[in-house]
Curated annotation (Swiss-Prot):
Biological processes, Gene Ontology terms: 5-phosphoribose 1-diphosphate biosynthetic process; purine nucleotide biosynthetic process; ribonucleoside monophosphate biosynthetic process
Family stated for the protein in its record: Belongs to the ribose-phosphate pyrophosphokinase family. Class I subfamily.
Chain residues that bind Mg(2+) 1: 130
Domain of life: Bacteria
Gene behind this protein: prs
Cofactor dependency: Mg(2+)
Entry GO MF terms: ATP binding; kinase activity; magnesium ion binding; ribose phosphate diphosphokinase activity
Places the protein is found: Cytoplasm
Major location category of this protein: cytoplasm
Sorted UniProt keywords: ATP-binding, Cytoplasm, Kinase, Magnesium, Metal-binding, Nucleotide biosynthesis, Nucleotide-binding, Transferase
The protein, known as: Ribose-phosphate pyrophosphokinase
Entry binding sites for Mg(2+) 2: 171
Listed pathway(s): Metabolic intermediate biosynthesis; 5-phospho-alpha-D-ribose 1-diphosphate biosynthesis; 5-phospho-alpha-D-ribose 1-diphosphate from D-ribose 5-phosphate (route I): step 1/1
Length: 316
């Protein structure tokens, strides 16, 4: 069987090292950097001819830098005669630009999928895409994993399950995700009726379902970016009498005013995974980071051995 090689870009080296430890491997050696004019530089420091190569690189902020680095890594491995190249993209940037919601705008998620495919990726492994239909933008197989089992197990271990909890969907678009969590955690479902006045301004109105008074409210989303929506929803739930509020997401983008908003919001804990590094001021006292490395490592092992990974596709 062809040898397995795992290379890491600079976007999330810690995650790559964790999943390598789970596979009892060392990260393959690669030199990455920039020329004085800002152009990316990539050189493989070991042979990949005939190897099964996995490139770990989320396209998180700085999105364009990390995307270009991923593309150069793919091209580098292709030209070095790797037998198969799998792009492991724990967080897929540009996923929110998956359709034309107004005239004269691009579908950038499709463009990025084309770039990754044309660069030479034979397969993509990703997690919690903002829009599941992005899988269809690729002309190569896409394995789409979910972090919900990892997050649910965390809340069960904290005894946040059963009749004392209410799972709150922060908007209509998250109802399916919230329903999945209620099946695992129990409790009732509540929905924040969110009315968006424009692309930047969100106004929360009412809570449908519940009840939330006296309950431990759990709120889930695929990502927290500027945190405006989820913090607004948390305030509404707090005003409705929830005794505790805990929020969780797969991708902690946490950009712009997110940290300030999360500090000021009536939120008891924030749970994210390590698809994106969380460092510096983002390490709030009430922030918990879970690892998806075991899940990704198992998927990589099964792909390498040409085994089924369908049982890893659980949304809950």
């Amino acid at each position: 069987m062809r040898e397995l090689k795992i290379f890491s870009g600079r976007a999330n080296h810690d995650l790559a090292e964790k999943l390598c430890r789970h596979l009892h491997l060392k990260p393959a050696r690669i030199t990455l950097g920039q020329f004085p004019d800002g152009e990316n530089y990539c050189k493989l420091d070991e042979d990949v001819r005939g190897r099964d190569v996995f490139l770990v690189q989320p396209t998180c902020p700085p999105v364009n830098d990390n995307l270009i680095e991923l593309l150069t890594m793919i091209d580098c491995c292709k030209r070095a005669s790797a037998e198969r190249i799998t792009a492991v993209i724990p967080y897929f940037g540009y996923a929110r630009q998956d359709r034309k919601d107004e005239g004269r705008v691009p579908i950038t998620a499709k463009l990025v999928a084309n770039l990754i495919t044309r660069a030479g990726a034979d397969r993509v492994l990703t997690m919690d895409l903002h829009a599941a239909q992005i899988q269809g933008f690729f002309d190569v197989p896409v394995d789409h994993l979910y972090a919900a089992p990892v997050i649910n197990d965390h809340f069960v271990s904290r005894r946040f399950a059963g009749d004392e909890v209410v799972v709150v969907s922060p908007d209509e678009g998250s109802i399916k995700r919230a329903l999945g969590h209620t099946k695992r955690l129990g409790g009732n479902l509540a929905i924040v009726d969110k009315r968006r006045t424009n692309a930047l301004e969100v106004r929360q109105n009412t809570i449908i379902g519940g009840p939330v008074e006296g309950k431990v409210a759990l709120m889930f989303d695929d990502m927290i970016s500027t945190a405006g929506s989820i913090c607004g929803a948390a305030r509404l739930v707090h005003e409705a009498g929830a005794k505790e509020i805990h929020i969780a997401c797969t991708h902690g983008v946490l950009c712009g005013p997110a940290i300030e908003r999360l500090r000021e919001a009536p939120i008891d804990s924030i749970t994210v995974t390590d698809t994106i590094p969380v460092t510096g001021e983002k390490l709030l006292p009430n922030l918990v980071q879970l690892s998806v490395a075991p899940l990704l490592a198992e998927a990589i092992k099964r792909i390498h051995h040409d085994q089924s990974i369908s049982e890893l596709f659980r949304e809950r």
